Amino acid sequence: MTADGVEQLRKPEEKMQICSFLWVYYGFPTSCYEGRNVEEVRFTSGLKMGQNDDSEVDCACGIPDSGVGMALGYAEGKGVPYHRAISKYTPTWPRSFMPNSQKERNHVAKMKMVPVHDLIEGKRLLFVDDSIVRGTQLGETVRFLYEKIGRAHV
């Protein structure tokens, strides 16, 4: 691309290959890729997990944001309620996979998730999270639940 115009160096391939990362993790819920809505794919994935899981749980919870759609599907498939046991506070925190050091990533993961203690204590919770980049958010959330709340089964 120059000020004089655009030149195509190579034609695109006939067959597209799209990254599934868009549906599971990075895609915005209203986006569609190859005719499939992101939120629908997440919900359906969770639904199938719930239908096939024999764990005994009191409720399903999603780790915001991309885990929520899957957790809603899981809850429906399993026949258990969905509880918003973790709220996300993001005005000052980036995505937890973005900082350069693991120490910073752990700090971001810990600070941006706020638990609702009354929905967690003494419950058998099933959390759904994508955690496909580094697993930092899920690891920090589970560690927090065990260390600070103590009476949750995760």
Regions found by a protein language model. Name each.
Residues 1-151:
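PRPP-associated nucleotide enzymes
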